[in-house]
């Protein structure tokens, strides 16, 4: 958590946040302002949670999952190790971000991933777009949407209340931190490439806010973007 007294903003947006002239993250995201300082997100979303995507590590007969991927490169000086970390941040109330960090030091890679996830934070459109449910509560997504990253393509479909998040365990983390409780996910392509899988889902969540929604559908589906608790 950032100490707002010690924080010295480097951007105009950061100064406006520190001075208290901007107090809502949705104001920034709705106006498409570019966030260049992770401290802005720390101040406006104090309840932000962090999770790390786990990669499957195979060493001989042993298999395990680790919150990082390690690669080694042979050089004249010897083997050089590089770590890759994917962080997912969210407040479970309509805001989520995903970031990738790389470094020869694991702690630095984690820090880079968290900071980039904060800089990439988006507000997520939620609603009840399932014809089987039609409860009007924002527990799912309002309509079907597709996302793509590399060779991976995903389709997100609204699900009735109680279905839960029907997806891979690592992908579930994005929806939980975004505040989505029920959704169906179909994945195509090389989904074992976890990095592309995660970013394909993130791409789909971004596109939820790109659709022009009619007033009657807003009322019918309980459509909302960003925070519900603070409205």
Swiss-Prot record:
The keyword Cell membrane does not apply. Gene3D superfamilies: 3.30.160.20, 3.30.230.10. GO terms for cellular component: small ribosomal subunit. InterPro entries: Ribosomal_Su5_D2-typ_SF (IPR020568), Ribosomal_uS5 (IPR000851), Ribosomal_uS5_arc (IPR047866), Ribosomal_uS5_C (IPR005324), Ribosomal_uS5_euk/arc (IPR005711), Ribosomal_uS5_N (IPR013810), Ribsml_uS5_D2-typ_fold_subgr (IPR014721). It holds the Pfam family Ribosomal_S5_C. One of its GO terms (molecular function) is rRNA binding. PROSITE patterns: S5_DSRBD (PS50881). Residues 61-124 form the S5 DRBM domain. It comes from the Archaea. GO terms for biological process: translation. Keywords: Ribonucleoprotein, Ribosomal protein, RNA-binding, rRNA-binding. The keyword Ribonucleoprotein applies. The N-terminal domain interacts with the head of the 30S subunit; the C-terminal domain interacts with the body and contacts protein S4. The interaction surface between S4 and S5 is involved in control of translational fidelity. Belongs to the universal ribosomal protein uS5 family. Part of the 30S ribosomal subunit. Contacts protein S4. With S4 and S12 plays an important role in translational accuracy. This is Small ribosomal subunit protein uS5.
